[in-house]
Amino acid sequence: MEIRPGVEDDLDELTRIYNHYVIETPITFDVEPFTPDQRRPWLLAHPTSGPHRLLVAEEGGKLLGYATSSAFRPKPAYATSVETSVYLAPEHVGRGIGGLLYTSLFEVLAQEDVHTALAGIAMPNQASQRLHERFGFRQVGLLEQVGGKFDRFWDVAWFQKSL
C-alpha cells in the first residue's frame, strides 16, 4: 500500500468515497452528493505543501481512502490550527488504513507551522472516536443536536490534539 498526496486524477474516486458518506451516513452533514467538478475546489485547497494536505491510500491502482488537514476557520489567527478528517472506501473499513493515513498525515504536519489539530465527529461514532484517541486527541466539547440529517438531530463532539 502506498500513501501519497492526492492529485487531480484521484478526483472521481475521492468523490465516490465521500458521496457514500453523504448518502448513507450522518458522518458528514452534507446532504446532497457531489459531482467531481463540484469537489474540485476542495481538492485544489489541499496542495502538496503547507499545512492543508490531502493524502490518499492506494493499493493495486485502487484508492482505499484519504485523510485531510484543512483550514479550521478563515480568520488569520487560526492559521496554525487545522481540522483533520479520514474517509475510507466502505469496502476497506476495518483494515487499519485510517491509522496509516493519520500516521502519514501527522508526520507531514510535524514539518509545518501547525500548533493544533481538531476533529469534529458526528456522534455516535465509536470507530472514529477510538481512532482519534489513539492518535492523542482528547474530547474538548460536545455540541448537542447541531446537525439535522435523516429525520433526526445529531451531536458533534470536538476533539483536539496539540502538535
Which ranges hold each PLM region?
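Conserved beta-strand-loop-alpha-helix junction that forms the acyl-donor binding cleft
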Residues: 93, 119-129
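Conserved GNAT acetyl-CoA-binding A-motif
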Residues: 109-121
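Acetyl-CoA-dependent GNAT
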Residues: 8, 33-91, 102-103, 108, ...
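Conserved catalytic-core motifs of GNAT/GCN5-like acyltransferases
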Residues: 68-71, 76, 118-121, 133, ...
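Conserved GNAT-fold acetyl-CoA-binding loop/helix
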Residues: 15-44
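A short beta-loop-alpha structural element at the N-terminal edge
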Residues: 2-14
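Conserved acetyl-CoA-binding loop-helix of GNAT-fold acetyltransferases
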Residues: 94-107, 129-134
